[in-house]
């Protein structure tokens, strides 16, 4: 019957198609478009007709059904049950062999009566293997989520502080090493029940053993679905370690990064919204120093540099060289140039080597002016595959050395946090006790970002006490040398105790705190190991809170909820343009619209007439100067990603970023200086070292726009910028892995600035030597000596303003003919009234501005202010004017300035305006 209806429907369809064909063939369209339109309309009409016919047929059936009685339908259903489902071919064959439903095959029905179950076998594990049974697939397995506690806010507990007398007493006992106990090395953890109950340890080990024979792939897959905090991942940093630091920083109330959280102003450095522009609110704060030990590839450091923002932090790194090295090229949240790596005397980064520890201590001391770092972070660990249960015993020396290094390099009052694993043995607990002696407060905590099924936790130490730390440091150094000696002898002996157990047990409060911590983490670890096992059995399970927890945690930790860009900034076309074109960076920050040719425009040379002005003005106070060491004019430097660009000879020249080591989005005015070294007697020569980059003015420092600040504040910011970029070692590593090489990049320093009232101080810093039958004038900046080729003057107020001197108040004020309504403005209001000149005012001279300036100089015979000018000190064979005349001639020489003439003009001005100098 069904086949017949199908045939009739097909005939009807063919009939309609034929009608359409006939209509089409008889119709003569005027054009192709008309033909297509007519066909479409006819086809639509036919479909509408078919739809109405089918709808009418369907409605008739529906009405017939609704006309019936519900009770009659029910009764009929009871009287006339539906027909049985016909047997399949397989069932008919089975019935022919005597099979009866619900029974098995065989003479006595002994065969199976249910279908063969789907396989629960995992991977290639042998049939019947215990590991296969423990994690066999079970699709009915359901995890009880009520056993977990999932929170966003974490509560940390600080251990009870030790009394001062107790600290001193313990330090006294450490001086003769009588507390150091040597015994046979240990390779079991099961019997360590002094600081955790036997039941908790046994249950944890049993839960761990389930996964010993499970493949890494299955374990990772189960963990990804089971860990409620797994999707937090690494956010926009290079790895998860960065988020651990963010997590710890927040829950410990920002003691790690030492952020000033008042009014949440610190968030202006790293806005949570991408549309908001970052602001360097810590520009005037001291530089923050930190060390990252055993922490390659560098997630801890990337977070800390990002959190501190701009150039407010300087990092030192120490980790194993090779595959576990820092991957600085993956730093995208900040610049790698604020981070300096060091690998110890043996150049291998082994933190357990006593020689390396001593060299690291000396290195950090040199890099921080002997003070040490504000924060040390340590994240050491190594593979213990197959021996996970005794990870604590295998890591004991690593524990010791990381904590020892903190005592070597952290400054007074500084902080420290370090990754630990289990702390069940007297050795580990003794170390923690000694940290309580060295630091004001100590805490043990496992953050959310540390996966709950492992034994990882962190010790956080606040407020180093040098008076006690120095004693403990020397003791732990002796312990480490003893461990090194036993290792080199391949002895089976070991240092088993750092201090007597009875001393630890006598501190009952400490014992209670350690036991409570161990019990809590052991039970929590066991719980999540069982959860992993449950999720491994049923792969359909996943933690439903992962998404919400990620969003809420990032918000609580004050970290933007965004992902790391694929391919870094090189995946963005706009960013690539900035990386390759200095004018893109220039246009981003400079408000002056100018062509590339105008960047090379120069201002008129310095003359004494620049300091001439109607009284009671004090024009000499309007200028600051720096000595120049290069024979040419200062150069504009723009750092734009992979390269830095120097403007020379009317065009930008590219310099490798690795050799200049200046972060992107930086615009500076620099003196490309050659260092001078002394030879025999009075002989001098140019150093063979790469040229030194002397910063003489700054516009943008790693995205921090300082161009509109007063000149002194710009230079102060530049000094901090240089300190953050400072290299303690002359050579740095370029590249990673087998491609790494040591290079000597250009060093950066900030030029010392002087006012004209400080001419005597400047002159006292000069040294005169005869060189090639001419006078060479040398000046010193820090550890460098340069030849003085010129002085560059910068006017610190805008062109339309003049500086006067108040006789009554004995302080300067500003006034302007163009702003007569403003009156006299005291120096305290200059920044508010935008009186200070900007970087662009004194560096970029547009053609129209230069023309206007030259006209003013001609009109006033040179007695007008100049935004910037250069006083050349170079000797010339065509004239006797040079360093000798400049320094020693008592008056202007042939109308050109000398030091004596300059001083005389300043003294005369002071006399007339009645300025009293202290």
Swiss-Prot record:
It catalyses: a 5'-end (N(7)-methyl 5'-triphosphoguanosine)-ribonucleoside in mRNA + S-adenosyl-L-methionine = a 5'-end (N(7)-methyl 5'-triphosphoguanosine)-(2'-O-methyl-ribonucleoside) in mRNA + S-adenosyl-L-homocysteine + H(+). Its EC number is 2.1.1.57. SUPFAM superfamilies: S-adenosyl-L-methionine-dependent methyltransferases (SSF53335). Keywords: Methyltransferase, mRNA capping, mRNA processing, S-adenosyl-L-methionine, Transferase. The active site is at 419 (proton acceptor). One of its GO terms (cellular component) is nucleus. The keyword Transmembrane helix does not apply. Residues 1-18, 43-56 have a biased composition (Basic and acidic residues). Residues 236-465 form the RrmJ-type SAM-dependent 2'-O-MTase domain. S-adenosyl-L-methionine binds at residues 298, 379. This is Cap-specific mRNA (nucleoside-2'-O-)-methyltransferase 1. It comes from Caenorhabditis elegans.
